[in-house]
Amino acid sequence: MPERSSEPFYGFLQRFKRWMEEHYEVEVHTYNCVDPMSDDVKAVLYFDYSWRYAWHDVILQRVPFEKRALMIVEPKNINPSIYYLSYYRNRFSSIFTWDKSLLSKYSSYKAVNVPVGAEPGSYRMNRFEGIRYSEKKLLIAVSRNRWSCMPQSTYKLRKAAYRYFESNCKEGEFDLYGKGWNCPVSFLERLFGFHRFLCYRGEISGSWDGKVSRMANYKFALCYENNASQPGYVSEKITDCFCARCVPIYYGSPGVEELIPRSCWIDARQFGSFQDMYDFIVNMTPERHAEYLSAIDDFMHSEVLNFFSTNHYFMALAEGLGFKRR
């Protein structure tokens, strides 16, 4: 497994190492610790690949083709080259993806889920059941400030939603959290300026636990996936809302209802305007809100939730690479 330098990925790698050793008696190492030509190395797994890697990737050249495996993590708007240029995918003998379009087109590709931030046990603890409806604020959004020129991106749309609710909600009704806000994220913003959100409340510390603990204090969450056009892309954005007992106003990919019951979330596409969306949530009765939470509780205690777990993700990778449980 080639090294990546981000702290979240390091934590993910440590969990993957422990899980593989416990369930498959397989050791997982970063590339600098092994010789890919050795018979002891059964596979070299890349998490995403793009033209940026290809320019200077001396690692892949040393890996026998039959050992090369690729996990396609990001959607088209973040890593377009892996989708539009098959040349990069053809460098690998095994490919894993959640993208249903690729899976239907290439029978050799292997299906995986988009892993969530915690295991089902954490989601099912229901720690926030004691927070009453009357104690909650109206609306929250938690996301990173991003920019993309790709048409599949929802960044422009969700930023428009944030600006609308900042301007039209009553004071204290809407709060924005996340990284990168109130600073430029594109050349045009650096050149012409950018909008400063007065509703911005900063970053949330404590990773996953801090995020859901903060969201638990709100009735609703604006929940826009980074990409809403690729079937199969359902990230932790919606399941984190469920853990926080915060009803998501969800803008996601086609076919979401095949994985998550429609009774658990509000479809952002059903509204003709942001004003219609605001009117819908501000006029919702406590009883109707409780119906959403009841549906969420049913889903959270169903076997379907296991599909979103990191354990399911690890198992799909292990078995797709040919490893067997001991």
List each language-model region with its residue ranges:
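Pol beta-like nucleotidyltransferase catalytic core
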Residues: 1-53, 58-72, 76, 83-145, ...
